[in-house]
């Protein structure tokens, strides 16, 4: 009888250890897969020497979204842009942390095309850089509603053209590539450009807001960019 009990106990322990080991292995595999899948989704262009500046912008957006939602109103857009102006500017250009962005400015930029162009024209950059940036942002605005992959491919193609340019100076290339990198990461976090799987997963939730988050993302970028140059 004692032998039977001993065998039963040993068998139970063996099964328990095996199950625990399999569970731990499964957990480790799942974690690795999730980490790999997440990292592969982060946009990056290794050929852009200023790509890290866009990643800094994404890191700030991620921090902001921990306690706030994606803007769905002029006031929320204003708050997010002010946060980015203060923190991105503070990290890079201490002399410009007093830059402000008002709800009135946000409303004008959301409603009309000319203020967007005027904002670029007011940047302290060369006419050549302004020309490239105006065309760049107009192209992005025209692609509202596109999935992120298409936006990303457009930006990478644009950056390739800038890098190969024989007419732009090095500092002009730096300015343009910094702006394009920030735009890459800003649009990545915009829920409007999530893939079809994401759309299906939220199909039973409330209808998406009419607030143009694509345009709002570009406006935040422009407001920050204006303080950098």
Predicted regions and their residues:
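Positively charged n-region of N-terminal signal peptides that target proteins for export
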Residues: 1-5, 18-19
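Acidic/polar, low-complexity intrinsically disordered N-terminal segments immediately downstream
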Residues: 19-199
């Amino acid at each position: 009888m004692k032998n039977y009990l001993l065998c039963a106990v040993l068998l139970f322990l063996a099964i328990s250890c095996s199950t625990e080991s399999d569970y731990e292995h499964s957990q480790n595999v799942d974690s690795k897969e999730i980490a790999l899948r997440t990292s592969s989704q982060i946009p990056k262009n290794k050929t852009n020497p200023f790509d890290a500046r866009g990643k800094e912008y994404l890191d700030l957006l991620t921090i902001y979204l921990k306690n706030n939602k994606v803007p769905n109103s002029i006031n929320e857009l204003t708050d997010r842009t002010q946060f980015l102006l203060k923190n991105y500017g503070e990290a890079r250009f201490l002399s410009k942390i007093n830059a402000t962005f008002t709800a009135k400015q946000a409303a004008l930029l959301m409603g009309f095309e000319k203020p967007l162009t005027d904002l670029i024209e007011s940047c302290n950059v060369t006419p050549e850089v302004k020309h490239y940036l105006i065309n760049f942002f107009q192209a992005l605005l025209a692609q509202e509603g596109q999935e992120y992959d298409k936006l990303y491919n457009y930006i990478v193609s644009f950056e390739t053209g800038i890098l190969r340019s024989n007419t732009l100076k090095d500092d002009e290339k730096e300015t343009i590539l910094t702006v394009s990198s920030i735009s890459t990461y800003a649009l990545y976090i915009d829920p409007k450009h999530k893939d079809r799987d994401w759309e299906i997963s939220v199909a039973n939730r409330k209808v998406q807001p009419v607030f143009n988050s694509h345009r709002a993302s570009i406006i935040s970028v422009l407001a920050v960019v204006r303080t950098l140059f």
